[in-house]
Amino acid sequence: MGIGVWELLLLFLIVLVVFGTKRLRNIGGDLGGAIKSFRQAMSENEDKPSEGGARTLEGEVVDKKEKDKV
């Protein structure tokens, strides 16, 4: 009991009548442009290494009690 082909076709025709072909074309173009911009932003983000990433610290671990004795 899902949506069949005829129901989808009827829904498309109703949307076409309500909005018109020109408006649907504009909406489709805007949606495509938004998706393209989103993909470009995601690929740019993957190319850049993060500056706030993890750093390796080197040194000697000293117990606080031993430090006070010296």
Swiss-Prot record:
Pfam families documented for this protein: TatA_B_E (PF02416)
Main location group: membrane
GO function terms (MF aspect): protein transmembrane transporter activity
Top-rank lineage group of the source organism: Bacteria
Topology of the protein relative to the lipid bilayer: Single-pass membrane protein
Localization annotation: Cell inner membrane
Gene Ontology biological process terms in this record: protein transport by the Tat complex
Compositional bias ranges of the Basic and acidic residues kind: 57-70
Protein name per the record: Sec-independent protein translocase protein TatA
